[in-house]
From Swiss-Prot:
Ranges of residues in domain Helicase C-terminal: 332-531
Lineage of producing organism: Eukaryota, Fungi, Dikarya, Basidiomycota, Ustilaginomycotina
UniProt keyword annotation of Transport present: no
Gene Ontology cellular-component annotations: nucleolus; nucleus
Protein name in UniProt: ATP-dependent RNA helicase DBP8
Motif Q motif per record, residues: 38-66
Start and end residues of each stretch annotated as Disordered: 1-39, 291-331, 495-531
EC top class named in words: hydrolase
Reactions performed catalytically: ATP + H2O = ADP + phosphate + H(+)
Helicase ATP-binding domain location: 69-247
Cited Gene3D superfamilies: P-loop containing nucleotide triphosphate hydrolases
Amino acid sequence: MPQVAASSSNVGPSSAAASSASHVQEVAKSASDPPKHTSFSSIGISPMLIRSLASLQIKVPTPIQSLTIPSVLEGRDLVGGAQTGSGKTLCFALPILNKLIKDMVGGFAVVLTPTRELGVQLHEQFVAVGEGARMGLRCALVLGGMDMMKQASELANLRPHVIVATPGRLVDHLRSGGGEEWGLRRCKFLVLDEADRLLTDTFKPELEYLYSVLPSAKTLQTLLFTATLTEQVVEFANAKRPEGKPAPMVCKIEMDTKTPETLEQRYVFVPSHVREPYLYHILRHPPIKPSSERVRKLNAKHQADRERKEENQRKSGKRRRTHHASDSDLDQDDDAALFLPATIIFTARCKTAATLSGMLAELGIPNVSLHSHLRQSERSENLQTFRAQRVPVLIATDVGSRGLDIPDVELVINWDLPSAWQDYVHRVGRTARNGKRGFAISFITERDIDVIHSIEDKINTKLTQLEGLEDEDKILEKLNAVATAKRVATMALHDSQFGERQQRNQHKQLARLKAEKRASKKAKSAGHDQQ
């Protein structure tokens, strides 16, 4: 079971993952033990918010919520460590809204996130709880990749209580002078979600600027949430505090090395050059059936789509046919592709995700992808499409999907095996939640044998071979069709100049860093000359 631990700083240095061990061990306990707080009312949450939570089917606090919320309500700075799906968003959203009810001032809280997708998700959760409480919450979403002029107008007119933002875009607005109208002078809370990613050199200039315009640390309550206690997070916990301000609480739910009991874990051991036909076969003949609720929704949607298509065909006076790569070589019932279980396929690289997405689309399997080479609007649309069950398959990188809570996943496929066992647990943990049945399949090649053995040792579970793949000749009958689809997808990527925008941005960032380094050296040299 997960381990619950809490301590005040100091947090030790060295190994970040175990950095607080010597200080939290004496109060550590199993999450299966009766929690100190078993209801939201017992931790001081307003009845208005409790009613809102109930309408969202949230009845009792999770272990990390029970552990952190009382300290936040007491006014303590806090470092909270928990995995995706543990309910950590409410660890800061509920205390912020609880205090905001008593003092509805603009610029009350700033919530920073490293990714736009996570920002959208955080904003949705604030709005959902706030609307349910009927408290008149004004929450703004300030992300890069969106119309800055429109954002500036909304900020000025809305005067939001809570701002959910990526650091770069928020700094852009503040530097442009817009912050004078909706500024952060009265800000009470600063939240860094996915703090291990925010407290890196990538975001350092933006964070330093934000610290300079926010109220002093003496009055500002700072909350960090992370899955990993990195060195930078530890430095924050150990940093010198203003006189009279206590050290931050460090609360952590230790990651469980066990996978859910309702999760079936299998492997497919095939040479790398024939993996694609096996993937296609598995998706066409999945080892787990979609839930009855999913089938009901898909049936309704499918019937509506068919009626609309037939109506269009009657109007045009002819029948339309969708062409896929080598249709004669493929299973003819393309309608069945819509009735797949909700599936996430994890890849190691953006290009792999894009190639698989194009290939499967050519083969008649509806899907969307989620990776950093997509534009913000594309990522948001793709994520919403999968969440709304309009397509059955999401192809994602770890970075592209990190921090996102994607419910009701029934099948996880590791196309590329992660090198770290923690990543494996995190991936497969997206299915088999809340006692539901789930299935995880890992593709393994000759190079992955040591890695899979290491993962099995850590999770104390032996993966078994996936059944139903004995007829290799039948599976490889689709080899030509699948190869054609992959070739079409690869050519489409090449024609779209895939990845060139990211390369240009990297070159610009490198040039900026070099310029800053030269300026710093020049300033130091001038200082020495004056001495």
